[in-house]
Amino acid sequence: RMSPSALQLVPDTVDLVERVREWLIPFQLVARESGERLLLSMPETDIPVTIDTERFAWVLSNLVSNALRVGSVGSTVRIVITQEEDDAVLRVEDDGPGIPPELEARLFEPFSHGRTAGTREGLVGLGLAITRDIVEAHGGVIRYARNPGGGAIFTVLLPLAK
């Protein structure tokens, strides 16, 4: 596991809402081509965060591409941005088959494998481990929860820019 302090960040203060909107443009096309829906729910107001935009774009890309990969025709991936007290909150929700319970405890460890019925991809490789390291290097937290309607919810909390 990489120490979060070992990551060299190039911080910039940006509006998370605007950036996420930009970063999701290519995924809108991918979702449309695979018959999936990508729904965005974000406030009209700015949510300022200090992030390494290149590394954080990778975090979003990993979470959204994982969600699209496990989906099927007609499934929906939701990206929700909110502000809760001193944190920016980014949630990526899917209605895919979900994570097998035996994998949940090791989800953010490198090379956790899991075969899930109906998924196009059954391997959890380095992606979530690297995602966690990047989020933690930004002073943030990433959490996983089961989506009550089926699927997964990944929540990233980031401190608001001072």
State where each predicted segment sits:
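Short conserved segments within the C-terminal catalytic ATPase subdomain
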Residues: 30-40
